[in-house]
């Protein structure tokens, strides 16, 4: 029998809004073929951020879904697997119960990653995409901002070195849950939300006051919504936007309340509730870091899981580069406290 020339790997992400699986065949980090993708929407984040626990009914739903994913993995002959959970599971008071139930019913061991590791995993995938577009951060600065349902990760890269990394608990769903429905519908919501967000941005403003930043790189759950509102291709791997275009959209949204947003942009109420937090957070970040061009990438956390599994295993130079990069961040943190 002819020996297989590739390995089959499955990455599973238990996110705040989606439980996703991606199965690939790979030889090395440059020869990867996606053979299956599954995405199932859940309200995991809303439950955790509001009630601090994952209800039993949702635990059962998650286990049933993962049993289905496990059957698919068996059908595709998956040899390697990584299952990782982020904010919603990380903050659930009954996290251990969920992980035990998943293991008992599926045999899958779930790794719950902390926020710095979550942001770094996503960053590696984004950086790889930017390099493929000829954007490497050499001789200039880039600020990467990843906004998820439960958190905001900010990474400043200058001359291909990580110079600053900070994480904030101000994700989109978390922000939405901080205001009730009546507050979100009011015309004063913009002002209240701006003040709410600005109060957390002081450390970033101070750390980046002398930074020379050419590109603002945006990623995260709601970037597809932003592209849709701008009338741009939501399926593009990389999208470049002039800062003026974004500010025009911000000025338009700034004058609207929730019912008006639904009417103007022809979107569902559940989606419209995320528009103001998303737009206002982006606008506040852009005010912190004046830049002429914004780049949006479609990379997800699951892409980072895949890259960090395959890359170091198949490419020694890439493994060494990751180590060097992590050391640059450690050295920078050390200098900050000296």
PLM regions: where:
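Active-site neighborhood of HAD-like aspartate-dependent phosphohydrolases
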Residues: 10, 23-26
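Short glycine-aspartate micro-motif
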Residues: 9-13, 142-146
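Entry/capping segment at the start of metal-dependent catalytic domains
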Residues: 1-11
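Helical "lid/coupling" subdomains associated with nucleotide-phosphate turnover
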Residues: 9, 43, 47-71, 75-76, ...
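Beta-strand initiation motifs
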Residues: 29-35, 161-166
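Short beta-strand scaffold segments in enzyme catalytic cores
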Residues: 19-24, 152-156, 305-306
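N-terminal glycine-rich anion-binding loops that anchor highly charged ligand groups
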Residues: 32-42, 76
